[in-house]
Amino acid sequence: MKAKHIFLTIISVMMLTACMDKEWEAPDMTEPAYGNNSIQQDATKQVTIDQLKTAYANAISGGGFQRITDDQQLLCTVIGNDIGGNIYKQIIVQDSTGAMVVGINGTGLFPFISVGQQILINLKDLCIGGYGQQAQIGDEYNGSIGRMSTKKWEEHMRILPSHDMSQIDTLDFDIAMDKNRYAGHLVRLKDVMIGDADGTTTLAPEYKAGTTLTYNGSTNGYVHHSLNGESMNALVLRTSTYADFASLVIPTEPVTLYGIATRYNSTWQILIRAADDIKVNEK
């Protein structure tokens, strides 16, 4: 009798364990939880960034927007996100033909779409246009190109398995580069002297009355520094006062800069993504 009770107890424990295993079974993590995994990659629908810029050139250059009605996809790689706080409510993507901004009305994007991540964007029903002639994908806002909602972004984007920055070319920046073609690209600037460097001035300090620094937008918006003495109407280093590296002291030595070369009309604006995008040259 005792043996029978022991046998029944063992069976009961085994059944309970099996039920618990079933109840607490780990979720299927083969697909990313962020984005829309139902978007199927279709080579016949894919367009390049250069093709988009060409097809919507008037909307981009004219400061307007146009809604994309064709069933098209963009296969691209993320080259800039909001991890360092200098890129705000947008990411920058690039393919072998060009680069552009994607406006998203949300923050904390970087844990889901890191630099080097390949993504597929369903373009149908999104808008394309230009902000200061910088090509941007997003949504309509007061008759111009603006940011899309995070809900819409997740519906129109799929994260792909590939994560490889080696496929992306880093251009050696030249101030004479064609802005229509190269704006938005990941670039490298060699042997650069950053303006306002005196051993104590930081990249983007909070605004103080009497400052000689150039602030763009609100007093605590962006700080512009010249590069190699070029006119600030032609080329600036643009850093947010809210960037994680805003308090970095500007090197007084020549540096190599890595960043995103965006444009605002005729002005090149270099956006660094993290403190290590500034590398002091070895002597």
Q: Where are the language model's segments positioned?
A:
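Sec-dependent N-terminal signal peptides
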Residues: 6-11
